[in-house]
């Protein structure tokens, strides 16, 4: 039975209460209050819904993650990185990145990054929790991604690309930066061929919860310098 959250109830049900079909649906309702969003990620779930739907909270099993030491860079991508065709920055234009991620795409109907969602994550950015990666070419924003950093974990949310390899260059740069700072896991949420090509793989929800419990409150061991 699906749990419905009130606007005053910040407690999520145990992860093992998530539905099998649709896979990982844990709860519905509530709001996108920053305190609730932080509680959700700390608990192991995230919001994902379309316009016109109630807020839906998910914890899929299995969970797609990337361990920084398992990052895979293909020969063609390595060549692109060596050519330095792009400039990569952190937290220079969070709003532009999330708006670009929310823009309509040819292969999808609508967007799950609704206006309330954008505003909520911009507030998390102002609080130093959400971060953006920008990829520039000739001073134009051509790719990027955003997500949340908690302890030694990074929770990726979405990425976009307007030039070949732009989002991959941004992602690889981020992963290397997080690895140097002592991060142990990057949550990719759901599987895609794009992420698997970079080394992401599936782990069980229980294993993901173990990493969450162990590392969400541990400070990075190196200089994060976002």
Curated annotation (Swiss-Prot):
Q: Does the keyword Coiled coil apply?
A: no
Q: Mind listing the UniProt keywords for this protein, alphabetically?
A: Acyltransferase, Cytoplasm, Transferase
Q: Name one GO biological process term.
A: protein catabolic process
Query: This protein is called what?
Result: Leucyl/phenylalanyl-tRNA--protein transferase
- Subcellular location per the Swiss-Prot or TrEMBL entry: Cytoplasm
EC number(s): the record gives 2.3.2.6
Specify one Pfam family. Answer: Leu_Phe_trans
The UniProt entry's sequence similarity note says: Belongs to the L/F-transferase family.
Q: Identify the species of origin.
A: Pseudomonas aeruginosa (strain UCBPP-PA14)
Which GO molecular-function terms appear in the entry?
leucyl-tRNA--protein transferase activity
Organism superkingdom: Bacteria
Main localisation, per the record?
Answer: cytoplasm
GO terms for cellular component: cytoplasm
UniProt function note? Functions in the N-end rule pathway of protein degradation where it conjugates Leu, Phe and, less efficiently, Met from aminoacyl-tRNAs to the N-termini of proteins containing an N-terminal arginine or lysine.
């Amino acid at each position: 039975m699906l749990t419905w959250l009130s606007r005053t109830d910040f407690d999520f049900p145990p992860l093992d209460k998530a539905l099998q079909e649709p896979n990982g649906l844990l709860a519905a309702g509530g709001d996108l209050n920053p305190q609730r969003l932080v509680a959700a990620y700390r608990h192991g779930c995230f919001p994902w819904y379309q316009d016109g739907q109630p807020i839906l909270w998910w914890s899929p099993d299995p969970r797609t993650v990337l361990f920084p030491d398992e990052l895979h860079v293909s020969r063609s991508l390595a060549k692109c990185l060596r050519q330095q065709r792009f400039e990569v920055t952190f937290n220079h234009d969070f709003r532009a990145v999330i708006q670009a991620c929310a823009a309509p795409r040819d292969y999808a109907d609508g967007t799950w990054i609704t206006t309330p969602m954008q505003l909520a994550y911009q507030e998390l950015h102002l609080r130093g929790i959400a971060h953006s990666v920008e990829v520039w070419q000739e001073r134009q924003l051509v790719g990027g991604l955003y997500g949340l950093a908690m302890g030694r974990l990074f929770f990726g949310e979405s990425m976009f690309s307007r030039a070949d390899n732009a989002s991959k260059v941004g992602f690889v740069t981020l992963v290397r930066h997080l690895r140097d700072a002592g991060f142990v896991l990057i949550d990719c949420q759901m599987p895609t061929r794009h992420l698997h090509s970079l080394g992401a793989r599936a782990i069980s929800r229980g294993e993901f919860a173990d990493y969450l419990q162990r590392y969400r409150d541990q400070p990075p061991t190196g200089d994060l310098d976002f």
